[in-house]
Structure formats: structure tokens, C-alpha cells
């Protein structure tokens, strides 16, 4: 890869298995506000730009997001086989449940709502303190044998939890969804501030970034424009004046929006990550997708990191 000023993007390991995927994954959490007709139009427009990967979860809109998407699949011109559909399960009201019975039932319900015979990826939404790897392995085997799920992954799992799961399951875990944005980049701070008596040096996730990169598990980044604990977007937020000034400067330089620069910052990392969008508006998704053609310089990447308030020892 070119060190500075180039346009070559990093290798996304998931693309070796699912060739239709790319740097952008369309998050469907807010699709309950759309009509099936609007979603169908979005699917076709994004397909024309090479964006074919959609992220669902059974809890999004209490299932309404998947239901409307399933209706849209019957209306759009893009064949189901061209799309990558992934969904997540395991979060119930007030507790987590990764039991065999719940996983199997959740997938059946997801498939019914999406009006499809299979998921390209099933992702375990969050770790369950009571999870038994042998139960999960049995569920995975049944789902794959029945043709209901092609591949599997996790979300918000530590390397240790992945190792525990891998001790029983027979399928490779292809993805780990993790929160990452320029301000919310603790997984990078702990590595950069190693051996320092600083807040940023604290390892909160078992060095998940290094581990996923070493294992070839693709990180899908959620909330790429958010900061704090669901406090909102950092774009144009008064708490981040220096960051927004630099984003504006780089946006002008590259002829894109600030959101595209924020996504390009994530895509610049050699781990080969994917950005999960959070918008229900086609234009905003296409706008962020311009990050696919950007390659920030090393100096620009570190400048954005520091502008968000992070420390370089």
C-alpha cells in the first residue's frame, strides 16, 4: 500500500468469501421510518453504485425494519442473490440469550420477516454471560445444514470471548461489529499509549483491534459519526471545534463531505474495516460512500485523531 497520497484501499478479508461486499455496509436500524417502496428504491439506487450489503437485527424497530425490507425485496429490481443480507440476534428485553433454542427461533423469524430463504451472515449481537459454546455450535451446525445461514460472525465480542466460541463452533467467525469513530477510538488509543500511565492506555477490550487484524476477522464499525455513550454526532458539535475545522479543511481538499472524511479515516486503517452507515436517507449513504475513493495521508490520519482530543505520547 502507498504510504501517503494514494487511492488504493486496504484488503477487506470478508470480500474473499463474499465478493459483493465492500467498504460500506448499509445499517437498517432506522428503516422503520421508511415505506417498502422507499426501501426498494434505495436498494436499486445503491446497487447501481456497487453497494449491496445490508445490516439488520431482530430488535431494530421490534422487527418492523426487517419486515419492511422483506416487502421491499419483492418490489425492487435487484435480485436477492446479488445482495448480502446479515442480521443479528441475542438481545431480548432486559437480558441476553444465546441459547440454541433462541438462536434457531430468532433466525426463523428473521427469515420470515425478510421474506428470504437464507441469511448470508448471522451475527451474535452481544456476548451472553450465560452462553454455552456447545449450544451455539449446535445451533450454527443446524442452521448451516438447513441452508438457512451461510456464514457467521459476532458483535461486541472480546478476543477472549471469540476464542471461547471458537473452541466449539466448526465454522469460521468472519466479522466482529465494534463501535468506532474518530472520537470513540479507544481500541486504537490503548495501543498507541502502551506503557504509559494515561487514561488512553487502559485496555478495555482485550486488544481487540490487533487480535482481529491478526486473525483476519473483518471489523464492521458501527456509529462511525457518533461520540460518547449515544450522545449524538460529532459533526458540527460544539464539543469538537478543532476536529470539525480539520474535517472541513480536508473535505474541501478532497471535494467531499465531512462525513466522507470521517469514514475515510476508518477505512485508512490497514485492518481492512467496513463502515456501517446509520442513515435512512439514500443521498447521505451515497455521500459517505465517497470515502471509498479516498486515501488519507498518514499525517492527516494522525491529525484527525489528535483533533478529537486523543493523545500522541
Task: Give the residues covered by each predicted segment.
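A structural motif
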Residues: 51, 116-119, 149, 173
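Hydrophobic faces of well-ordered beta-strands that scaffold small-molecule active sites
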Residues: 22-27, 54-56, 83-87, 122-124, ...
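Short, acidic/polar
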Residues: 34-46, 98-114, 160-163
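Structural motif corresponding to the early beta-alpha repeats
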Residues: 76-101, 125-126
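Beta/alpha (TIM)-barrel catalytic core signal, keyed to glycine-rich beta->alpha loops juxtaposed to Asp/Glu
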Residues: 131-313
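Acidic-and-aromatic substrate-binding clefts and catalytic sites of carbohydrate-active enzymes
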Residues: 31-37, 57-67, 92-97, 127-132, ...
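Active-site groove signature of glycoside hydrolases
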Residues: 111-132
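N-terminal binding-site loop/beta-alpha segment at the start of enzyme catalytic domains
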Residues: 2-83, 145, 217, 226-228
Amino acid at each position: 500500500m502507498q504510504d501517503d497520497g494514494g487511492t488504493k484501499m486496504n484488503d477487506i478479508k470478508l470480500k474473499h468469501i463474499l465478493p459483493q461486499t465492500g467498504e460500506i455496509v448499509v445499517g437498517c436500524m432506522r428503516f422503520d421510518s421508511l415505506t417498502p417502496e422507499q426501501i426498494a428504491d434505495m436498494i436499486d439506487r445503491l446497487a447501481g453504485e456497487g453497494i449491496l450489503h445490508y445490516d439488520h437485527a431482530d430488535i431494530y424497530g421490534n422487527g418492523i425494519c426487517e419486515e419492511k425490507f422483506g416487502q421491499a425485496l419483492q418490489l425492487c429490481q435487484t435480485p436477492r442473490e446479488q445482495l448480502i443480507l446479515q442480521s443479528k440476534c441475542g438481545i431480548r428485553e432486559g437480558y441476553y440469550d444465546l441459547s440454541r433454542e433462541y438462536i434457531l427461533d430468532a433466525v426463523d423469524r428473521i427469515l420470515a420477516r425478510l421474506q428470504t430463504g437464507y441469511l448470508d451472515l448471522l451475527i451474535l449481537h452481544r456476548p451472553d454471560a450465560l452462553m454455552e459454546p456447545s449450544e451455539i455450535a449446535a445451533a450454527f451446525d443446524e442452521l448451516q445444514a438447513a441452508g438457512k445461514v451461510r456464514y457467521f460472525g459476532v458483535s461486541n465480542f472480546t478476543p477472549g470471548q471469540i476464542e471461547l466460541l471458537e473452541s466449539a463452533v466448526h465454522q469460521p467467525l468472519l466479522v466482529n461489529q465494534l463501535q468506532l469513530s474518530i472520537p470513540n477510538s479507544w481500541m486504537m488509543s490503548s495501543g498507541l499509549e502502551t506503557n504509559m500511565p494515561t487514561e488512553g492506555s487502559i485496555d478495555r477490550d482485550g486488544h481487540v483491534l490487533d487480535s482481529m487484524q491478526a486473525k483476519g476477522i473483518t471489523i464492521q464499525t458501527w456509529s462511525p459519526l457518533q461520540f460518547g455513550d449515544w450522545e449524538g454526532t460529532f459533526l458540527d458539535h460544539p464539543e469538537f471545534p478543532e476536529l470539525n475545522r480539520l474535517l472541513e479543511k480536508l473535505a474541501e481538499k478532497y471535494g467531499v463531505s465531512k462525513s466522507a472524511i470521517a469514514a475515510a479515516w476508518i477505512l485508512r486503517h490497514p485492518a481492512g474495516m467496513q463502515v456501517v452507515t446509520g442513515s435512512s436517507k439514500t443521498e447521505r449513504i451515497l455521500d459517505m460512500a465517497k470515502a471509498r475513493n479516498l486515501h488519507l495521508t498518514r499525517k492527516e490520519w494522525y491529525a484527525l485523531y489528535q483533533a478529537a482530543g486523543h493523545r500522541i505520547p
